[in-house]
Amino acid sequence: MARRRYLVAYDIREDRRLRNVASCMEGYGERIQYSVFVCDLSDQEAVLMRGDVEARMKPSEDSVMIIDLGRAGDSSRFLFLGHHEKLPTSAAVIV
C-alpha cells in the first residue's frame, strides 16, 4: 500500500479545540511548527485523519489546510531557512 506525505496546517480559534486538534494530529504525524504537521499516511489513514480533525474543529470559525506533497519519504519539496525540526522518516502511529 503506497503512502503519501501530507502537510497539515491549521488555525483553530478556541484554545480547547486547538489542544484537541493538536493532540489528534500527534497521532498521525510529526509537528514541524506550532500548528503545522507532516504526516506519511496510507489512503485509509488520510481518510481517518480528515474525519478525526473535522470532528474536533468548528467549520464556521476554524480552518485546516491539508496539502498532498506526493509519495511518503520525499523531502525534496521542503526548503527550510534557519532552525527547523527534522522531517519524519517513519510511518504514522495511530493511538
Describe the predicted segments one by one.
Residues 1-7, 13-95:
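Basic nucleic-acid-binding interfaces
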